[in-house]
Swiss-Prot record:
Disulfide bonds join 4-12, 11-27, 21-34. It is found in: Secreted. It comes from Conus monile (Necklace cone). This is Delta/kappa-conotoxin Mo3964. The cysteine framework is XXXII (C-CC-C-C-C).
Length: 37
């Protein structure tokens, strides 16, 4: 959606507090950005 979850975008926050990204990216907790796995 161009807002979160894709590469170099912020991690998406779920209602339960988890930070997630779209496949295949992973959330880097130290920067809260989505990067390569």
């Amino acid at each position: 959606d161009g807002e979160c979850g894709d590469k170099d975008e912020p991690c998406c926050g779920r209602p339960d507090g988890a930070k997630v990204c779209n496949d295949p990216w992973v959330c880097i907790l130290t920067s809260s950005r989505c990067e390569n796995p």
